[in-house]
Amino acid sequence: MTWDDHKKNFARLARDGGYTIAQYAAEFNLNPNTARRYLRAFKEDTRTTDSRKPNKPVRKPLKSMIIDHSNDQHAGDHIAAEIAEKERVNAVVSAAVENAKRQNKRINDRSDDHDVITRAHRTLRDRLERDTLDDDGERFEFEVGDYLIDNVEARKAARAMLRRSGADVLETTLLEKSLSHLLMLENARDTCIRLVQEMRDQQKDDDEGTPPEYRIASMLNSCSAQISSLINTIYSIRNNYRKESREAEKHALSMGQAGIVKLAYERKRENNWSVLEAAEFIEAHGGKVPPLMLEQIKADLRAPKTNTDDEENQTASGAPSLEDLDKIARERAASRRADAALWIEHRREEIADIVDTGGYGDVDAEGISNEAWLEQDLDEDEEEDEEVTRKLYGDDD
């Protein structure tokens, strides 16, 4: 529909039904400001001098009273066309009104969260009834405004939860307050949803005031923030408690190790144990060997005592004798000489193989004698290394 059609429809509805521009814009799903701009001037033009709307259009006076029977057929056709046009306009207006109503209904159904709130309300109500059971299995009735004071039943529910989890006195007190606050906050949330639901049912359908849905959303956002804060508080308390418990276990374990080490030293003095035996006793009882005892064990293992009766050859306590040192030195020298002999023999074999296969001996690879090269004198800056030659080829070569 064009704005001309809207002007005609608005003029008819304003004349017959007393429609306002706002109502017309809502009926036809129009922008109120745009409708007001287009229809206001037309509305002012349609008013009469005495501000009364004529029920029927004013007909112009006939210029002549001459009856022209030749135009009767034309006049009848004109009246029929006007009636058909009026019916067509009425059908268009009715269809537009129905379409606008359907669109408004779809918009209201889409924006209305009555079903969501009902499901949430029912779930929270069931949870509230489930959480309001005391230790004896008795159910108490929740009254509006209970969340404003200290809820005893919430404290009882919190104590029951803490007894199942296990905690000390301080942690129990802190968690009890946090959990009771959390339960009371959930009760307040459930009550607010119920009250806003009742208020929405009682509220009339008008354009003024904040919709209840926005109030519910604001309340749920606040409750979510508070619940998250309480959950973080409870989580921090539990972590601190676990950390303190681990520290206490470590302290007890260290104190137990100190007792085991002390008992090992006492047994060492009483039974004349060695340091190694005392360390074995500590490890057998789950303790940790002290660093000083470990150093003593390492020193004893590096320098064991000798079982010789010769006091002249005996050095300081725990040190090897001079004969042992001389024997060890001779064995190592013989081992080095044997290794050197093996190395020289191996090198001789490698050089002989190179000379024989590479043609560097008396005869080259092609069978030609190398005497000319062997008899060649050394350069001025070259000297024959007789020691190396003697080691490689012997004195006879």
From Swiss-Prot:
Keywords attached to this Swiss-Prot or TrEMBL record, sorted alphabetically, are:
DNA-binding, Hydrolase, Nuclease
Residue ranges of region Disordered? 42-62, 304-325, 356-397
Biased-composition ranges for Acidic residues? 374-387
- The keyword DNA-binding is assigned to this record: yes
According to the UniProt entry, its GO molecular function terms are:
DNA binding; nuclease activity
- Regions of biased composition (Basic and acidic residues) lie at 42-53, 388-397
Described function: Necessary for recognition and cleavage of the phage packaging site (pac), together with the pacB protein. Both are probably the two major subunits of the phage PACase.
What does the subunit comment say? Multimer of two distinct subunits.
What is the protein named?
Terminase A protein
